[in-house]
Amino acid sequence: PAAYGAPLGPPPTRGGPHAIARQARRGSTLMLPTEDSLWVGAELARRFGLPYWQVTTSATDANRFVLRLCRMLSGRDKVVVFNCNYHGSVDESQVEFDAAGRMVPRAGVHPNGVRHATTTRLVEFNDLDALEAALAHGDVAAVLTEPFMTNVGMVPPAEGFHAGLRELTRRHDVALIIDETHTISCGPAGYSGAHGLEPDFFVLGKCIAGGIPSAVWGCSQAQAERIWAVLPHFRPGQAINHFGFGGTLAGNALQLAAMRATFAEVMTEDAYRHMFQLAAQLEAGVRATLEELRLPWHVTRIGARVEYLFMTHAPRNGGEAHHARNGLIEACLHLYLLNRGVLLTPFHNMALTCPATRAEDVELHDRLLRDCLGELLERPS
């Protein structure tokens, strides 16, 4: 399983580190575009189907900037997010439902003066009726979501959910932001590309620059034209204005060199084919162990991402997934595997295969998982 912060692994030794080191010697930030920016921009448009892109230093910042744009375009204050979501440290997303179904600050996260009742509407993933009710208030600027929830266990979209989500957001003139920072493990164009989603804005981060902090956000032609219509006009070359977006190091030369190497050499069809093959092997091995031991658990895979959760079926929403978790068992599994040479990602039971993963790595994980669960089942309850 690969490191969580760079789920595709670093660029290959031949090209990626060389490109990063070469650019570092020439200068990491120039406050000017480089030729790499032209290549990366064209590749993002080709790969993800959106024509316009900006670079940030984290997916959190990308989400923040897009939300600011959506508020600017709509004149509305609120954003809809789904319960147990993950969009980095975006303030509007740091909420959850309590036992009474009320929206409250997420456990362990101080509200920091943010009055979430004025910024956020919270609904459960896959609940189109609740989503429609939230949008009907007329105060929502955007819906921000992963296409497949990944940070509370894995929650797949129900059949028809994405079609309904897109129809409702269009009907209520609400921007749809798809955050694929995790689900880029689904393929070279992410879950959206594999399943034909049509977001207004697209966010991607974490793994796209071989470990160099980087993220991007893209937008459709229609949204770009709306942005141009409301931004102040100025004469290029005679005035400078960042309009409150970006930052001094956003889009720097080192980021673009690393992104070019990663897209060209790591996020390739061949690499994903290898990752998918080993992830399927991992999924099959975990499922066989669960069936052999008659454990009421299940395993889910999307692309190169595999997760096992302590319930008989895939959860329908984040709340259901959250209630199925068991911190003590999770800690035991992680520590048992770690002490024997297998490092799972640090949250829940999720594994990512990467281009460097080998079949023997998967076999080791499966054998150790079987040993660990066997020992646990032999202990008195």
Question: Which ranges hold each PLM region?
Answer:
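Conserved N-terminal phosphate-binding loop of PLP-dependent enzymes in the Aspartate aminotransferase
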Residues: P1-S381
